[in-house]
Amino acid sequence: FSFVPRLRSPKLWRMDKLGQSVSPLEVIRNGNRKLHAVGQGVSYPGEDGWLALNTLDTALVAPGERCLVNFNNRQPKLAKGMHFLLYDNTWCTNFPMWYEDDACFRFEILFG
């Protein structure tokens, strides 16, 4: 699921990590800048408006680009939005290569 709103200051995106509001741009060099586990979700506290995208069923979010195994030290391009990983079997081990059941992933979008 990708959420790419037009924002005046996309560098203001924040993620809820262990109950703390963290910028995706504050990840140290050689840290994982591409994929994060979030608690409540992500938010944008901009002058042009406030929004929160709360995830109720999935925790993994890729800021900037949909990239699962692209590990590099470049900062994410936050104007490209937030992308939530709903299902994956990149590794092809210990899991079937398909999903036989129905799935439901809920999100809550708040504006202010």
Predicted segments, located by residue:
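C-terminal (or distal) subdomains of carbohydrate-active enzymes
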Residues: 1-112
